[in-house]
Amino acid sequence: MLRRKPSNASDKEPTQKKKLSLQRSSSFKDFAKSKPSSPVVSEKEFNLDDNIPEDDSGVLTPEDSGKSGKKLGKKWRAVISRTMNRKMGKMMVKALSEEMGDTLEEGSASPTSPDCSLDSPGPEKMALAFTEQEEREPPSLSRQTSTGSELCSPGPGSGSFLEESPAPQYTGPFCGRARVHTDFTPSPYDHDSLKLQKGDVIQIVEKPPVGTWLGLLNGKLGSFKFIYVDVLPEEAVGPVRPSRRQSKGKRPKPKTLHELLERIGLEEHTSTLLLNGYQTLEDFKELRETHLNELNIMDPQHRAKLLTAAELLLDYDTGSEEAEEGAESSQEPVAHTVSEPKVDIPRDSGCFEGSESGRDEAELAGTEEQLQGLSLSGAP
């Protein structure tokens, strides 16, 4: 008698139970169980059709269901992060390719940054490199995308903001100079103090009463303590400058009339003046406007030059004579005082009375004379 093959209804029920338990374990995790200390992501490629091991009875134990749920959760997270990283990488590559296309169209008007060389890969190669990098190292792609914009920035002034413009050097005013007598090296964290070496000369800018002065040394403006320096005495510049100007501006007095006329540029009148008696500078001093009329010199510029030269020559001689007289007069009283001998003048100290002794001597002399006169008159 033929037996009927049993139906597979009993076999289907365990599989349905397994699917339900799998879905529940993946959606609702076992929160009561502690997490592993060092979870390791499986390097196998994720496949939803993987067979899950089961025991002999065909029903999963709670421990197996928890482990499978954790594995699925980790795999889902890896898939999501991988897809997001790929999307972000593609967006960054697209943005970079657009920027590079714009710069290539504009031309090489502005120099590119030094980080980008001329042999840099095109946008397609960069896209391929990004995708390969994503497949090899999915976790570190977020860092690469965050720093991807810094790899090649075609901006014209990428490093210009790093270059600081040099500060203009201080040129004055100064209130004195000081020489360093003790070496001083400031702390490396103190950028305002000057490094002092013995013998350095500092141009003092400010001398506050606190004791920390401001000065210029070797082109650097900074502070220093006054105890390390000696203030140099200021040079008497005022009276010296006029004498230098006078010595530079003053020419020596001309010795001949021809030399004087050469200086004022009127050599053409040399023969006229010599023929009419103006042979020396002493004669030229007496030149007046009427004399020029007699000499037939009618050019107003020439007349003015000749008259001015005569007046200056006269003033020069009179000034030198007065200076010589003043020097002689200043030397005479000194010689007089030196040549005078010192005379000792007796002074009465007041201790002795000399008037009575003098009177007694005078009376004695008078009596002697009277006696002599009487004796002469009484003689026969």
Curated annotation (Swiss-Prot):
Domain SAM: 252-316
Region of interest called Disordered, as start-end residue ranges on this chain: 1-76, 96-168, 318-380
Pfam family, one: SPIDER
Tissues and organs where the protein is expressed, per its UniProt entry: Preferentially expressed in lymphoid tissues. Expressed in bone marrow, thymus, spleen, lymph nodes and Peyer patches of gut. In the spleen and lymph nodes, expressed in both T- and B-cells. In the thymus, in the medulla and cortex.
Comp. bias regions, Low complexity: 22-41
GO cellular component, one term: cytoplasm
PTM sites of type Phosphoserine: S27, S34, S42, S97, S110, S113, S120, S320
Modified residues annotated as Phosphothreonine in this record: T61, T103, T112, T318
Keywords, alphabetical: Phosphoprotein, SH3 domain
SUPFAM superfamilies registered for this protein in UniProt: SAM/Pointed domain, SH3-domain
Compositional bias (Polar residues): 141-150, 369-380
Coiled coil, from the record: none
Single biological process term from Gene Ontology: positive regulation of lymphocyte activation
Biased composition (Acidic residues): 318-327
PROSITE patterns: SAM_DOMAIN, SH3
Keyword Phosphoprotein: yes
Domain SH3 residues, every copy: 173-234
SMART domains xref list: SAM, SH3
Record's function text: May function as a signaling adapter protein in lymphocytes.
Protein name: SAM and SH3 domain-containing protein 3
Organism per entry: Mus musculus
